[in-house]
Amino acid sequence: MKFGNSRNFEQCYNLQAAVDTDTMLIVGTYPTRNCNDKMEIKKCVESISEEVKRNKKVFVCADTGYFSGDLIEKTEKEHPKVKVICATERVGHGRTVEQIFEKLPAELPEEKAGEAMTTEKMRARLRTGKGQEIYSKRKTTVEPAFGIIKRVMGFRQFLMRGLENIGIEWDSVTISYNLSRMHSLKSLALAKE
């Protein structure tokens, strides 16, 4: 797999996790050998448990690497309660004065059934208040979960080999993360009482 923006290739796996924005619990996981995330959005949605998708509308926020119009369109057709919010290009961190005071539409735009997912359609989703609200949660939801797994739990490399074994080990790591997170949520709930 190509490592970062360098010319180096390393033999490694790409770990995927779907994290709930409200609880920060990991609700779906799987490893892959694909070097980038371009073809992963459908698999990621399918890794989310059916109980989560059945009970409410699911918004999936993903960074630029996941954007593939055809795959997003296919995913949304197969999973009608799922709406993908995905950046189409890298955007700088700073905002201009015009961008700060720009009036954005409040809700996601209406889309006709059967219409192809294009870069422009995804940009239109992101240029709404709801789209920006959902997308802004991405970096404060998924990144902390991976940070806790790596820094707090000390998980940096796999002990097993092979995609199936890596999947089992990754599931074990995310289960232990979820148990720790549920304990924290329980403590917070008791403190509020």
Sequence positions of predicted segments:
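Anion-binding and metal-coordination hotspots
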Residues: 1-193
